[in-house]
Structure formats: structure tokens, C-alpha cells
Amino acid sequence: MATPHINAEMGDFADVVLMPGDPLRAKFIAETFLQDVREVNNVRGMLGFTGTYKGRKISVMGHGMGIPSCSIYAKELITDFGVKKIIRVGSCGAVRTDVKLRDVVIGMGACTDSKVNRMRFKDHDYAAIADFEMTRNAVDAAKAKGVNVRVGNLFSADLFYTPDPQMFDVMEKYGILGVEMEAAGICGVAAEFGAKALTICTVSDHIRTGEQTTAAERQTTFNDMIEIALESVLLGDNA
């Protein structure tokens, strides 16, 4: 039945949901890549859709910005609508010089300055890692497409406008591939409620060089990332 944030019924969502931050990107993904699409959520403008990809039922829904927002939607999808796997498909900022604009990054894990996972984990550090099979399937899907992806750690920040830019030096030293705002939270929710999660990002801006993509490009492109996510679902079904 409907929750405070999702006005759908059991069965409206597939067992796998792709989740971009921007609900308009969710609409673009549904209209561009899925067939037989129907809208399944519009509460607070957080659009959700269900359709098929090569005959496989898949849903796509926005999750908003930041760990608190994405945690609400991920939790309700898992506990109230039977979702088993969440693939976040979003954007990230690069801090390393060898990571370039529009590179695709598959997050094996996510560091964070948020305390949300510590609240879940009795004030201890929780290693927010992606599901191994989902990660491997995404890497294999990228190889099949001929897309060179980066695989490693992300950093999920609580603040978009950080007061401590020196932290970027620390991230670079530790090999962080991209800075975003949700991966660690989605992994934590998935672990708490018995689901699986993965984050795939496209580099939308470079924190060091100042290069950036446009808002329109972020909303309506990044197709390699989406196709990798969708194809990885099919590989998971055939495993």
C-alpha cells in the first residue's frame, strides 16, 4: 500500500530499481530506455516509473539529494514494495587528475562524513560496500559495451558546499574516484533491510580543473552509465 512518500501499490515496482537523484532524469531514463512505461509515483514530484527493458521488468525513480532523502525512498521501496536491488545512477565530482569528465565510475564502496550509518551501527564505523555480484555484473556489462570504467571508492558528502576544501587533498591521497552525496546511505539502508545496492556515477564536474557538464546534459545524457546499469540487471538474471 502507499507510504507517506510513495503513492503506489505492491506490485507496481519491479524487484530492481534504478535511482537517479533527479526525478526528471528518472523520467528521461524511463522514456528513453524502457518500453510499456507507466508512472507509479509522483508524490512531492519524486517521479517513479515501471516498464520493461528487453522484456525484463525494471523500475526507475528519483531519490533526491543527500543521504536523508535517498534513505527515505530506498527504505520504503525495500520494506513496502518488495524491492530487492537498488542501482543508484548519478553524477559525481572528480578530485584525481587521472579521472576525467564523463568517466563512468563504479563504486565498490563509499566513505562518508555523514553519521547516518553510525546511527544505524551503534556508533561504530560501517563499511558501506556494494554487492559483489552487482558490481561484477556492472563491470562485465561495461566491458561488453567497450566502455572503460573506473572501479573503486566514492565519498558521500553531507555538504555540497564544503567549508573544508583541504579534504579534497585527503580524498585524492586515499584514491577516492568521485565525490557524491548518497552511495554510503543507500548501501546502509540496503544492509539494514536485507537488500542489495550498487552505485554507478558519471563524472559531471572536476573539482580540481573546474570543468563541468551542463544541467541539461546531466538530466538527459550519461547514456553509457544507464545502459551499463540496465545490462547488468540482465547479467544478474542469467547468473
UniProtKB/Swiss-Prot annotation:
UniProt record, GO biological process: purine nucleoside catabolic process
Domain of life of the native organism: Bacteria
Assigned EC number: 2.4.2.1
CDD domains: PNP_EcPNPI-like
Catalysis performed (reactions): a purine D-ribonucleoside + phosphate = a purine nucleobase + alpha-D-ribose 1-phosphate; a purine 2'-deoxy-D-ribonucleoside + phosphate = a purine nucleobase + 2-deoxy-alpha-D-ribose 1-phosphate
GO MF annotation list: purine-nucleoside phosphorylase activity
Glycosyltransferase found in the keyword field: yes
Sequence positions that bind phosphate: G21, R25, R44, R88, V89, G90, S91
EC supergroup of this enzyme: transferase
Subunit structure: Homohexamer; trimer of homodimers.
Family the entry assigns: Belongs to the PNP/UDP phosphorylase family.
Protein name per its UniProtKB record: Purine nucleoside phosphorylase DeoD-type
Gene that this polypeptide is encoded by: deoD
